[in-house]
Amino acid sequence: MEDKSHEELYEHHFFEVEKNHDLMDWHIHYVGRGGISSFAISAIDIALWDIRGKKLNQSLSKMAGGAARSTKAYCGGIDLNFTMDRLLKNVEGYLEKGFNGVKIKVGRKNLKEDIERVSAVRELLGSQNVFMIDANYSMSVDQAIESARAFSEFDLLWFEEPIIPDDYGGYARISSETGMPLAM
């Protein structure tokens, strides 16, 4: 980041956060999007928004257009290795805090364990609450298809990151073969 875009970034006013973000994004495109490059852009982007907010004496929500009262939020955690009891206690805690949407991690070595966990959480949530799962890119296309078919009975809003994000053909295949809504 420093070698490629700092001179041009310094030439732009820090209030132009969006332009600066686009500039940084353009300068790193040849090394790939994601990974450490996107982390560096994110860190600078956050700092620029912070500077802008402090100079304007405004919160980020105000700079983004004001507080919205209709935004839905869900809760989730890094729970892949939790015992079933701990997982369900976490989900109960989310519900007690007023969340009506929950996302859990899947991608255990044994699909049967994932199915048991998804089934137990869906039972706890009931049909009135939204439910999503996230595999954090842990599956092959074939594993994701098998998993999506197994999870289809649990009324999931989406299946997030079943495979690596750049495999567009794989996402298309999972979607067409299972009908499962996917999130990348």
Task: Go through each PLM region and give its residues.
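Short acidic active-site motifs
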Residues: 143, 167-170
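N-terminal capping/lid subdomain adjacent to the active-site entrance of alpha/beta enzymes
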Residues: 1-131, 136-138, 142-145, 149-153, ...
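Active-site core of metal-dependent hydrolases
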Residues: 148-165, 181-184
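C-terminal helical cap(s) of enzyme catalytic domains, especially alpha/beta-barrels
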Residues: 173-175
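Short acidic loop-to-helix transition motifs that present clustered carboxylates
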Residues: 138, 164-168
